[in-house]
Amino acid sequence: MKIAAPLLLACLMLPSTASAADTDAASGTSGPLFDTVAALDRTVFDAYNRCDLETFATYFVPDVEFYHDNGGVTWTREDVVEGTRKYICGKVRRELIPGTLRIYPIKDFGAVEEGEHRFCQRASGQCEGVAKFVMVWRREGEAWRMTRVLSYGHRAASEEEMRAAAAAQH
């Protein structure tokens, strides 16, 4: 019992000795991994928004699992790309909502990316939908590919969110 109390106290003090840089990295909002995966997010969704499906496809493993709260589960890269061609191309544009992106490492594998995004109708320019997302990225050498995607919490954008989206476009 005499040993347990000092050991418990030492364990409780460990988190308080973390540096500011460690805290930023632990928050998922900065650092080299954040920069890398944020750049991947920009590149993959640039391809998505331009309907460059050949490039878009390269960011998914062949057996990707894509879980969508409204659309169900998609089990392959080919089906993800086909769904994008059928339901997205020329109709919708995706925008990352500033300040929502978080990225965390997965030891000896890659990273988890989470955030919120909005979807804007190409015809009207209105950003009417908002959703949360999680993407699991696998690193193989210099290549990064998504193995799992969750897109959930889809809802209509509030008036305030629609105004913020319109302001961001100008």
Predicted regions and their residues:
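A solvent-exposed, acidic/Ser-Thr-rich amphipathic alpha-helical stretch
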Residues: G31-D35, L53-F109, C127
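Short beta-strand edge/turn micro-motifs at domain boundaries
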Residues: V130-E160
